[in-house]
């Protein structure tokens, strides 16, 4: 459909609230549906023309459309990723032989049979969802949304439209993924100074559900409420694993084909692009606390659980949490000592060999992330030069075209509050000897 027709369609769109209000990827309003590239392109045109309210309106609409596409992709790929139905297995090769070539031929047929089954499933699924009824956006545009670039324009558009509360939320949302972007940090401090907003009122519009639960668990941990802390930390861990699986599934969406290649190199190109997206899931889902990303986020949750369970006298869970942590940081001397301590007193607590094994979800996550990185390293090492594979690097973010002048920061409102949360602490056990802790009393 031509841009003019889409423009007429959007005349029907009422004033948008928060971009995710009343959202459903199954029942997305038909009057709000249009190509992501069209919505975003129009938003930037309005931005350049200083039509701030119209620009903000289309930027918010584009963010909703991006979420619609992301969630729809994840839904279909998750629902089509189950085990393949049984395929007839040839007893021998095409010439009746049973040698290695025949086995390779049979294995390849089964593999492509599974691929065809999955493709058919995806086609059926996507026919029913609104996101796939409009043209698919370019790859670079999706990367811009992943890096939260639209919020860099949105906060300034809201500011110029005199919507300071929304400007604060948009600027803060951008900084949560780009904490070192000094210009946006300056904007945010300026907005906060005008409204006298504290840290507790800042909202990340793209925050994942596990982030707030994790932060609450850490606060409870630091206050000594270990039981409530473990409950929240377990919930945060489970929610993170769910979001991580959804992110992996979403990486198998449509891909651009920019040139002609032989069959297997073409498949390798598509696979490498999907691999890069899946490896990036771990980074993109890492929470930002006070301007700093939580290093080894999953391992950190197991670290908190290990010490909290120990304080609750649940040594079996403490030992399993320690073993899970060691998957991600096997050289941590403190955790090594903790495991030695648990093993030394295993008879006292009735611990068995299986109590020193990593938890199932930790093992699965570790194996997934490790194998994905190994495969991606392989593509960089062996395929990029030989097959001229284009593994593009993420481009640096452009600045908004209309920066604030120095005069707009003069006088009242020029605040430089730090965003670092004072309560953030590492687990107390880290850096301490396990034997230095008092032994829990058995009841």
Swiss-Prot record:
Belongs to the leprecan family. Glycans are attached at residue 367. Residues 1-18 form the signal peptide. Disruption phenotype: No visible phenotype at birth. Mice are born at the expected Mendelian rate. Two and six month old mutant mice display a decreased ratio between trabecular bone volume and tissue volume in tibia and femur, plus decreased connectivity density in femur and tibia. Osteoblast number is not affected, while osteoclast numbers are increased, suggesting that increased bone resorption is the cause for the low bone mass phenotype. Lysine hydroxylation of skin and bone collagen alpha chains is strongly reduced. In contrast, prolyl 3-hydroxylation is not affected. InterPro entries: Collagen_mod_leprecan, Leprecan_dom, TPR-like_helical_dom_sf. This is Endoplasmic reticulum protein SC65. Interacts with PLOD1, P3H3 and PPIB. Identified in a complex with PLOD1 and P3H3. The lineage of its organism: Eukaryota, Metazoa, Chordata, Craniata, Vertebrata. The gene is P3h4. It comes from Mus musculus.
